[in-house]
Design a protein with these regions (language model features):
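N-terminal secretory signal peptides
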Residues: 1-7, 11, 15-24
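Early extracytoplasmic/lumenal segment of secretory-pathway proteins
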Residues: 32-94, 98
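A ligand-binding cleft/hinge motif common to bilobed small-molecule-binding domains
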Residues: 95-101, 220, 225-243
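Short beta-strand->loop
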Residues: 107-115, 127-130, 226, 242-254, ...
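Periplasmic-binding protein-like
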Residues: 135, 197-202, 240-264, 300
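A bilobed periplasmic-binding-protein/Venus flytrap-type ligand-binding module shared by bacterial periplasmic
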Residues: 138-145, 180-183, 257-269, 276, ...
Length: 344
């Protein structure tokens, strides 16, 4: 019975996507002991299917169905579902999280329902959800090809610029990196133009310009030897035998947090809290930190791996963070400008 119900629900989700909306989704019911949670395609999906799905079944007898969707696709489907959420739990980065809060698609969150609340740093749970993974963004480089860059401006100088892999504002790490680069040339949180102008000057020298998802492959293939990225990507490539190291820029590494949220109108709130409690628990966080997944944990009882860029989670409070409420309204125009001016 359960398999049929969830399969039908996901089939309708896929069908609604093909038809350009999720209007077919209202009224789909869960089987007892089930939960549908979104996940990011790729490493997130692989990790959660391998680790979290079986653990949740074993611990709480909940059948977890993963729906792989990028952040804005999650929000779009939830808004189109007209109050009958196609899934019960979202996973989002800072920018989309604010869009979703403004769109009213989350249930209010009660962190006291998590038995592991005391195991995560203060402020990692709020009225809307809980942080489940940390991200640290800086510069990756091939130590056999180029010396370690010291800061963002080095990326526009020799020998780094001719080996640079450049990507735009489509991702959180790309947006954050270009903002920090722009600050070195007089730009600001809401004005990346000075940085874009400098990039345009050296564009003919840049090794590769591509979509964010393509950058790890380009680096692995040797088509670029320097890029801005997160520690998870660096650890994953290193695990594949790629010559790659991570450096924190002199002006500071960037940090942000990936959060999970309970969908407004879900009938599976109790199961959702059990799922979130498991995700931030020591066992899951420790398993996710290991290769080949290389997540940065949020549970204070999990010792950080030696190759992490900090000794403990408290250090991240000193890292650069951005106000996505100010970035979001401007980001679409930035993406358009980058795609127009930086295409090679």
């Amino acid at each position: 019975m359960f398999t049929r119900n969830v399969f039908t629900r996901r089939s309708l989700l896929a069908g609604a996507t093909a038809l350009g909306g999720a209007s077919l989704l209202p009224g789909i019911a869960h089987a007892k002991g089930s939960l549908v949670a979104t996940t990011y395609p790729g490493t997130w999906e692989d990790a959660y299917r391998s680790i979290v799905v079986p653990l949740l079944k074993k611990k709480d007898d909940i059948d977890l169905e993963m729906a792989p969707l990028f952040a804005m696709d999650q929000i779009g489907k939830a808004k189109a579902s007209r109050g009958a959420p196609p899934f019960d739990v979202f996973v989002l980065d800072p920018g989309p999280r604010i869009v979703a809060i403004q769109g009213g698609i989350f249930e209010k969150f009660d962190g006291k329902k998590l038995s592991n609340l005391s195991k995560i740093p203060d402020g990692f749970a709020d009225d809307w959800g809980v942080c489940v993974s940390a991200q640290v963004v800086g510069i990756a480089y091939n130590p056999k090809k180029v010396p370690a860059p010291k800061g963002w401006t080095d990326l526009l100088k020799d020998p780094w610029v001719s080996r640079l892999g450049l990507t735009g504002f489509q991702t959180t790490f790309g947006t954050s990196s270009i903002i920090e680069l722009s600050k070195q040339f007089g730009g600001s949180l809401t004005n990346p133009d000075p940085g874009l102008a400098e990039l345009k000057k050296v564009l003919p020298k840049i090794a590769a310009v591509g979509l964010p998802a393509a950058m790890p492959g380009l680096f692995q293939q040797g088509q670029c030897d320097v890029m801005y990225t997160n520690t998870q990507t660096v650890a994953t490539l290193k695990g594949k035998g790629v010559d790659i190291e991570f450096v924190k820029p002199e002006s500071g590494a960037i940090s942000f947090y990936t959060t999970m949220h309970i969908a407004k109108g879900t009938a599976e709130s109790a199961n959702a809290y059990k799922y979130l409690d498991l995700v931030v628990g020591k066992d899951v966080q420790e398993a996710l930190m290991k290769a080949p997944y290389n997540f940065l944990p949020v549970n204070k009882d999990v010792p950080l791996a030696p190759d992490m860029p900090m000794k403990n989670l408290d250090e991240m409070a000193s890292y650069v963070q951005h106000d996505w409420a100010k970035i979001n309204p401007l980001r679409a125009a930035w993406i358009e400008k980058f795609n127009k001016e930086m295409a090679k």
